[in-house]
Amino acid sequence: MNKDTIFSAPIEKLGDFTFDESVAEVFPDMIQRSVPGYSNIITAIGMLAQRFVTEGSQVYDLGCSRGAGILSIRRNLQTNQVKIIGVDNSQPMVERCRSHINAYHSDVPVEILCDDIRHIEIKNASMVVLNFTLQFLPRADRLELLTKIYHGLNPNGILVLSEKFTFTNQAMSELLIDLHHTFKRANGYSELEVSQKRTALENVMLTDSIETHKDRLKQAGFSQIELWFQCFNFGSMIAVK
């Protein structure tokens, strides 16, 4: 696993964070050291797939990055009569995802598309995964995407939505942010790396509160919604049709 050192030296003109070649190369290390509970979420996605994915249906991973979620799903399927569709708008991510998926033999077909997830038709879906993806879309586009997902899910289909959260209580918000930064420092990131990455992300990662997510999911059509995992200001929700 290549180590993330992208923000280890001072960057004079710090642009917005993008999922470019340099990020794709170190992404597994970056996300493990940056997102508390990421491995637990990936493991649980497989458990949910085991329970919810049905024969003859499709599974979508929207914002699939290098394919960790897809592999977890595929390992846990009860049938190979399923198609998994992974979508990411980063060509470097897609190339590595295809290579990663192809390194493991399976009879379950997987299609990896380089596209904007807003352009993808969702149909005959038993499971849709949005793993730290929605927060990178413009807020104005989020309800439309979730509504499309709801309509594309079969009855008893599941959406897994993992996000970084904001909190309305200022003291709690500051505490959880500080704990997250402590987590990153404990994983070897310097103060400079934490600061520069935060600055690079502030215009492209627009986070919402848990309440906002729940309200939006209800507007999209879901009625069974629950936060099933949280670690500091990161977490994951499930919504069942």
UniProtKB/Swiss-Prot annotation:
Question: Which Pfam families does the record cross-reference, listed alphabetically?
Answer: Methyltransf_25
UniProt-annotated binding residues for S-adenosyl-L-methionine: 38, 63-65, 88-89, 116-117, 131, 198
Chain's role: Catalyzes the conversion of S-adenosyl-L-methionine (SAM) to carboxy-S-adenosyl-L-methionine (Cx-SAM).
**Enzyme Commission designation:** 2.1.3.-
Q: What Gene3D superfamilies does the annotation carry? A: Vaccinia Virus protein VP39
Question: How would you summarize the oligomeric state and partners of this protein?
Answer: Homodimer.
UniProt keyword terms in alphabetical order: S-adenosyl-L-methionine, Transferase
Q: Which reaction is this enzyme known to catalyze? A: prephenate + S-adenosyl-L-methionine = carboxy-S-adenosyl-L-methionine + 3-phenylpyruvate + H2O
Please give the name of this protein: Carboxy-S-adenosyl-L-methionine synthase
Q: Which organism is it from?
A: Actinobacillus pleuropneumoniae serotype 3 (strain JL03)
PANTHER family attached here? CARBOXY-S-ADENOSYL-L-METHIONINE SYNTHASE (PTHR43861:SF2), TRANS-ACONITATE 2-METHYLTRANSFERASE-RELATED (PTHR43861)
Protein family per UniProt: Belongs to the class I-like SAM-binding methyltransferase superfamily. Cx-SAM synthase family.
Query: Which GO molecular function terms does the record list?
Result: carboxyl- or carbamoyltransferase activity; S-adenosyl-L-methionine binding
